[in-house]
């Protein structure tokens, strides 16, 4: 969709009435790019000691990681005594850390590193600061701390302080506000990392209090947690910016649980989504040293550069092909560059193609394939490469042209008095594309040109009025990236532009329902753009509509709602996703596993996040001339963990 795809990426459809407040950020100069470093937890859990910590910190320097930006070295849980000192101060476990924290801070600072400490908003075990925030902040500063990771264990009084509570009785912002205020009173700047596992949608309030916030539950030593984490990141990518970074959790690279391609995918996506890059493996201790392949991944300068890019804009999800097992993310970089990632969710290696219009581009003068180590020049419309099972095609694109624009010098070739433009892209098969032809200079007198799309189409004669430098016409195109447009002309052409049809929107209110599916009215300004939705779609409950169209493949944008956040389920099957299927004229359904859309608290926000719409596009084949029966549901949902589909707001068919 030349001009449409650049706009329909995966956007929260609260676009008409954004109920999110302005997100203030700390103005202390810290974390202008995402923080990088190393943390004890993923490998050593709550059992770190001084020897382990010093050895790994030294490895940051010895392995060249510190020079690349990995400078925060953090001791996570397990460093405190169970009781405070007589004056109320926290102290370290002298058995595990005999030199003491001030000496450890000095050691790190002498290495050119920064000292990270760990605390907790609760009452016990993790280094609790509840009702001791100012005292603890002053203590951390006196020890020479440079950052504080602040957890939320044992904090829910109404339930007797369980270790973890995913549905607290009150909002979490006030609890973190106390420590944030205490840190801001210090003379020493301390990076504040909010870690309450994504509960209460911290993206709305954490940027005003800290420099990063955990978007979800812990990453686990299982490949499926990467998909789960990315699905939770989708509605939060636009919250990222200098001084405020969504934290996808510490890296598993080097822990021996992911394959090399999986580690490359994990590292690539954490980097381009602007997550803090915190190593969670053993770099070097008395018995363990990180393997060379994982170290190579952690030291990949281009990928680190995308994470630390001065523009500070996160990549976002652009397209997902659930049935085919791959998806595309992309985002802008400084100096007009673009980064794109094509993830292969299947377990086998295969060739995958990136259609550049899916990321808002039509061509690139230079494409770097980072993990393949290759470079291509003058790439037009699409790029194909081999991708390992569970691997990622990570690309940097330079010298790009926006989607829908076809300069003659790139796409055109002369043929007599004509010009042939190749590799013209169309998201849908449609008769309603708009072609704009740009001439090198103003046409002095009336003339005519002819346009032919493909080899077998009838030629179209277009009158060119005098004193014009551009003329437009409506043309047919076939879905795909191999359309050709031949223009016979007597005046020089510089470029053509192709704009997709606007499409027709069909709100869910126009669909009839079966089974338990029901229409629900949402709060004012929500469930955009309709104001209502269909919920409880399942294998036996559907929404059915009749949509007129021409024959062929169509690009369809679906407005959906999903806020089934995986908290306790994240340790097992939870994926932060729900399915939607579209069946056309009784044919095989197209399945789309949609990520979260909620942009408000799942506990206290309007509609508990179930009124926040997002949009995702899918190609649907099998349209016929005339009326088409469209069924939205969750075919085969009974076979998995998702019996209910995402809620359905409406869809737009581009024809």
Curated annotation (Swiss-Prot):
Tell me its family: Belongs to the glycosyl hydrolase 27 family.
CDD domains named in the record: CBM35_galactosidase-like, GH27
Where in or outside the cell? Secreted
Q: Where does substrate bind?
A: 196-200
List the cysteine pairs that form cystine: 126-153
List the record's Gene Ontology CC terms alphabetically.
extracellular region
- Name this protein carries in UniProt: Probable alpha-galactosidase D
The UniProt transmembrane annotation reads none
Show which residues constitute the signal peptide. Answer: 1-16
- Could you say which EC number(s) this protein's record lists? 3.2.1.22
Q: Tell me the organism's taxonomic lineage.
A: Eukaryota, Fungi, Dikarya, Ascomycota, Pezizomycotina
Q: What is its main location?
A: secreted
**Function description:** Hydrolyzes a variety of simple alpha-D-galactoside as well as more complex molecules such as oligosaccharides and polysaccharides.
- Name the active site residues: 151, 218
Q: By its UniProt entry, which Gene3D superfamilies does this protein fall under?
A: Aldolase class I, Galactose-binding domain-like, Golgi alpha-mannosidase II
Q: Which UniProt keywords apply?
A: Carbohydrate metabolism, Disulfide bond, Glycoprotein, Glycosidase, Hydrolase, Polysaccharide degradation, Secreted, Signal
Query: Which example biological process does GO assign this protein?
Result: polysaccharide catabolic process
GO MF terms held by the record? alpha-galactosidase activity
């Amino acid at each position: 969709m030349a001009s449409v795809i650049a706009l329909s990426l995966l956007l929260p459809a609260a676009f008409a009435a954004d109920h999110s407040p302005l997100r203030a950020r700390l103005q202390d100069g810290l974390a202008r790019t995402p923080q990088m470093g190393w943390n004890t937890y993923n490998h050593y859990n709550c059992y770190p000691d001084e020897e382990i910590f010093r050895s790994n910190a030294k490895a940051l320097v010895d392995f060249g990681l510190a020079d690349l930006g990995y400078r925060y070295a953090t001791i996570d849980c397990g460093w405190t005594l169970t009781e405070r000192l007589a004056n109320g101060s926290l102290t370290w476990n002298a058995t595990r850390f005999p030199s003491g924290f001030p000496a450890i801070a000095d050691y790190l600072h002498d290495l050119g590193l920064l000292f990270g400490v760990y605390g907790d908003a609760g009452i016990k075990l993790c280094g609790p600061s509840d009702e001791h925030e100012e005292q603890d902040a002053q203590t951390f500063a006196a020890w020479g701390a440079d950052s504080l990771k602040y957890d939320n264990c044992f904090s829910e009084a109404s339930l007797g302080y369980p270790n973890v509570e995913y549905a607290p009785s009150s909002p979490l912002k006030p609890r973190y506000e106390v420590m944030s205020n205490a840190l801001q009173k210090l003379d020493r700047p301390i990076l504040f990392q909010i870690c309450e596992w994504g509960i209460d949608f911290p993206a709305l309030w954490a940027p005003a209090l800290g420099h990063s916030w955990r978007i979800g539950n812990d990453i686990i030593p299982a490949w499926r947690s990467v998909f789960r984490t990315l699905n939770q990141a989708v509605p939060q990518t636009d919250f990222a910016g200098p001084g405020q970074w969504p934290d996808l959790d510490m890296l598993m690279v080097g822990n021996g649980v992911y394959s090399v391609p999986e580690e490359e995918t994990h590292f690539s996506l954490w980097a381009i989504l602007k997550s803090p890059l915190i190593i969670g493996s053993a770099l070097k201790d008395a018995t363990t040293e990180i393997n060379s392949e994982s170290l190579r991944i952690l030291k990949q300068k281009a990928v680190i550069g995308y994470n630390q890019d001065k523009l500070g804009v996160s990549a976002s999800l652009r397209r997902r092909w659930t049935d085919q097992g791959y998806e595309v993310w992309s985002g802008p970089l400084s100096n007009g560059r673009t980064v794109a990632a094509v993830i292969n969710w299947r377990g086998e290696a295969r060739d995958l193609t990136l259609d550049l219009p899916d990321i808002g581009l039509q061509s690139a003068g230079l494409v770097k394939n980072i993990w393949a180590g290759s470079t291509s020049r003058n790439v037009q419309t699409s790029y194909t490469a081999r991708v390992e099972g569970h691997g990622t095609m990570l690309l940097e694109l330079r010298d790009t042209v926006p989607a829908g624009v076809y300069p003659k010098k790139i796409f055109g070739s002369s043929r007599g008095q004509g010009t042939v433009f190749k590799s013209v892209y169309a998201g849908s098969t449609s008769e309603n594309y708009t072609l704009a032809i740009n001439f090198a200079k103003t046409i002095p007198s009336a003339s005519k040109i002819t346009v032919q799309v493909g080899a077998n189409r009838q030629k179209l004669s277009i009158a060119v009025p005098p004193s014009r430098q551009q003329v437009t016409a409506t043309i047919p195109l076939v879905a795909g990236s191999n359309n050709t447009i031949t223009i016979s002309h007597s005046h020089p052409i510089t470029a053509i532009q192709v704009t997709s049809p606007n499409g027709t929107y069909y709100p869910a209110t126009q669909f009839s329902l079966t089974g338990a599916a029901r229409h629900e009215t949402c709060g004012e300004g929500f469930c955009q753009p309709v104001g209502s939705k269909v919920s409880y779609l399942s294998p036996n409950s559907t929404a059915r509509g009749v949509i007129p169209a021409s024959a062929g493949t169509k690009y369809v944008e679906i407005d959906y709602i999903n806020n089934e956040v995986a908290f306790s389920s994240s340790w097992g099957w939870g994926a932060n996703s729900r399915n939607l299927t579209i069946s056309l004229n009784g044919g095989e359904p197209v399945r789309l596993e949609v990520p979260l859309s909620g942009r408000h608290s799942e506990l206290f926000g309007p509609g508990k996040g179930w009124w926040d719409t997002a949009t995702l596009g899918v190609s649907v084949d099998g349209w016929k001339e005339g009326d088409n029966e469209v069924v939205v549901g969750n075919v085969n949902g009974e076979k998995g963990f998702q019996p209910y589909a995402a809620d359905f707001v409406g869809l737009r068919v581009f024809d």
